[in-house]
Amino acid sequence: RFMRIGVNVEAVTDTHIMKINSVLLDEECAVIGISVSGRTEEVMTSLKAAKERGATTILMTSRKDKTFLGYCDEILLFAVKENLEKGKAISPQFPILVMVDILFSHILESDKFRREAIHEYTLNALDAR
């Protein structure tokens, strides 16, 4: 979805790819780490490495911890009920999806004319119309 409006993104869950990507980052890049618990070691390590390379770092989490400020430019907190990571009542990923949608909308609106034109180009490239 982001790529269709001209934002070059990559979703990475593999630890090895996270490590490889961390050496390819620079000040032109942004890294968004997502960890419901705020304790996912691979995500935190990747954010620290990205910060060292000059990338903008953003953490999406439910955990409020001042130590994140040492390597995160932005911390987006979302609310979850206790034990939701076990999926009993509502998926803990739901707030994350909402935040990603908000981010998408913000990026789209930041340069709407250009982003909509790029969206048209990508649809044409896919013969989606």
Explain the meaning of each model-derived region.
Residues 1-98, 102-111:
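Glycine-rich phosphate-binding loops that contact phosphosugars or nucleotide phosphates
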Residues 113-129:
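A short, charged, Gly/Pro-tolerant segment at domain boundaries
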